Amino acid sequence: MKITVSVIKADVGGIGGHTKPSDGLIKAIRDTVENSGDLLIDHYIGYCGDDTHIVMSHTHGVDNEKIHKLAWDAFMAGTEVAKKEGLYGAGQDLLKDSFSGNVKGMGPGVAELEFEERPNEAFTVFAADKTEPGAFNYPIYRMFVDTLSNTALIVNKSLASGVVMNIMDVEKAQIASLRLWEDKPTIEAALMYPGRYVVDSVYTKEGEPILDASTDRLHNIAGTYVGKDDPIMLVRTQKNFPATEEVGSMFNNPHFVAGNTRGSHNMPLMPVKLNSAASINFCIPIVESLVFSMHNGKLVGPFDGFSTPDWDYIREIATKKAIAIRSQGFIHPATLVPSELEYAEGYRARMDVLETKMKPMEDDKSNSDRKENYEDPD
């Protein structure tokens, strides 16, 4: 049976700031989805920080207009409640005035896979808040490239043969299909820069879908800062794919990601329990793990993948790393480079003042001898 799993998320309002959606907002979204008739086989609704996600199973394929419109209508209903309740950032991820056939490029994040359902279909959804799509680069690399992190890359015949990894240039809206293991150095070079190059999807070499992730950057759509992109990722697990615990353990080393308060800092990505609010301790970037089984499109779960006691220790590591880097204040790399600052207009205003105070240096070197571009040390 061919099934599509669609995961669509958006930030349409938070209590007192970028914290969590209200009960009324969640109810409005749930009511809209539940009143969709027989469009869906099953669904689940939850949140990560102030982002609400809708997990849907159906038979309509990816990029289906009816499915995307349902999600759009649900988020619009949530937005109306957010406005009535005075929630912060009401509708902030809905960047267009009306639905135009597909929510991609309109603000909400989307991860979708269509596949022939296995007898024991298993998949995990990773929902993140206060960060950008490139936050998943490091965990995905560990899943499919790093044998020190994932023994399956040695002992599992399918994974050992390599996968096809589609990497997107989010600045130019271009995509490259790269193969392991022949393109390993190229993949690594791209993933060095998660602000520009992000993993869009992963397939087996036989064309079986394994992973899909949201890749839209909100400031690329809106032209100005409206919030961090808060990505979502869908990963099929078990058998010829990474095991559930192999996928989950890729988040056990809280790596530094762009995001945090005002979307302008580097901070560790903290694994948290399902339906966790965003921290008001500088909005540490967070990620949740929703583990599902599925049969004939009916969902069982989610199991809270980051709820067991061992993850409390990982959260402690993330907290200590967060405190350490925030103690550096505004000095890079605690903050992002100017081109990645989400409040760039304010920074430019400060630099304009600085520029008016700059005077030529009086020495023997001409201006033409001076290095003007300090990004390239060579």
Feature map (PLM): residue ranges:
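Regulatory and interdomain segments flanking nucleotide-handling catalytic cores
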Residues: M1-D378
